[in-house]
Curated annotation (Swiss-Prot):
Name of this protein: ATP synthase subunit alpha, mitochondrial
Keywords tagged on the record: ATP synthesis, ATP-binding, CF(1), Hydrogen ion transport, Ion transport, Membrane, Mitochondrion, Mitochondrion inner membrane, Nucleotide-binding, Transport
Annotated positions for site Required for activity: 373
Gene Ontology CC annotation, any one: mitochondrial inner membrane
The organism's taxonomic lineage, starting at the top: Eukaryota, Viridiplantae, Streptophyta, Embryophyta, Tracheophyta
UniProt cross-references to CDD domains, sorted A to Z: ATP-synt_F1_alpha_C, ATP-synt_F1_alpha_N, F1-ATPase_alpha_CD
Source species: Helianthus annuus (Common sunflower)
Amino acid sequence: MEFSPRAAELTTLLESRISNFYTNFQVDEIGRVVSVGDGIARVYGLNEIQAGEMVEFASGVKGIALNLENENVGIVVFGSDTAIKEGDLVKRTGSIVDVPAGKAMLGRVVDALGVPIDGRGALSDHERRRVEVKAPGIIERKSVHEPMQTGLKAVDSLVPIGRGQRELIIGDRQTGKTAIAIDTILNQKQMNSRSTSESETLYCVYVAIGQKRSTVAQLVQILSEANAMEYSILVAATASDPAPLQFLAPYSGCAMGEYFRDNGMHALIIYDDLSKQAVAYRQMSLLLRRPPGREAFPGDVFYLHSRLLERAAKRSDQTGAGSLTALPVIETQAGDVSAYIPTNVIPITDGQICSETELFYRGIRPAINVGLSVSRVGSAAQLKTMKQVCGSSKLELAQYREVAALAQFGSDLDAATQALLNRGARLTEVPKQPQYAPLPIEKQILVIYAAVNGFCDRMPLDRISQYERAILKSIKTELLQSLLEKGGLTNERKMEPDTFLKECALPYTI
């Protein structure tokens, strides 16, 4: 029996099938790994890829395209390259590196890609920001005029820092560079407790580059015990992490800090340290076969740091009046500040705090060399009272260092020289401070006022710290508050502190 389907039925059936037919094609440009090793993958076939674009390997590991060549693309791998092998597929993502940002990040420890590593679960509500963005333009900026207190007498009096400034901390290893940065974070606890609005609070971002994991864990413990983690974010690219993550970590931390800057708030970011970032970038560049320059660093190592530090800024009132203050750390070798990386970063920043091994071992801690340290814009942000009190102390310290060198050779000194040596020794003693014990600015003013105005001149040097403790123990709150008033110290206002300091000095003078 012959089967002859009706034409109408076939037509209807085909039409219904065609109308229900749906394809959701996703077109991805893919390439294949030609070679891989030392964290660098050479990939063939990604002809349309853009510089700085993220890619994904078959193993799930991410990477970023840095070298675009005729035959292949040089990709640095964010993670272990052991799971990647020759012939693996590589897929373009069409996006550049971004990280989470927002207040949900506060109190968390994350890696260079913003993934939490503190074992406290995923991040809650947050936005994502690109790690590489242009720095604010000239019109969007405003000159630095608000103080950023560190809680260290040596810094707040002689090398003041303002919100939106970039102040370099430079020195040999084991001279207390990180201690200065940590004390600054701890000091914001008491500063934030006084703030009356969100626009006064200072949030902190600490970026650990190439440090030991034990050091980072110790830092988390110190900040947690001081309740400082509640306003801090830690970005850690430790020594065991691949070089690309150590290179990326400062930019990731900066993107997190920019969230506060761009939303009318204030943030402080510490890069500890940029020398290790430069070394990681040198390793990547040499493996990508880029031509080496001085000290084998690539030619664009200046741009590596300048584009990062230019993102620290004080925004104008029209753009929200937020700020991002940067404290980059650079490690020198045997005090050589004329090496390549230090000479690159010093002109980018607005001043430097120099720490020295010799001062550290002499017991002057923080070991800050006041002669070499400078703040190019911070004095505009300094409190008027502090400016009045320590105005002449930097000159006196410079004269003291000059005379002290000569006084070693001869004992016949006139009375004026003897008085200068005596005062200089006391001005050197007063800025000494124990670690993790930042002082509020009004207490700093009072202690420095006592030294500058001669209340310590007749005291033995070993009694000055006792005198300082006695001042801080018995001071009245009203007197401290009067030191913060905008008018500065007038002759009438000086009478009360003078009387108080004279009474406190009596038990300690010879």
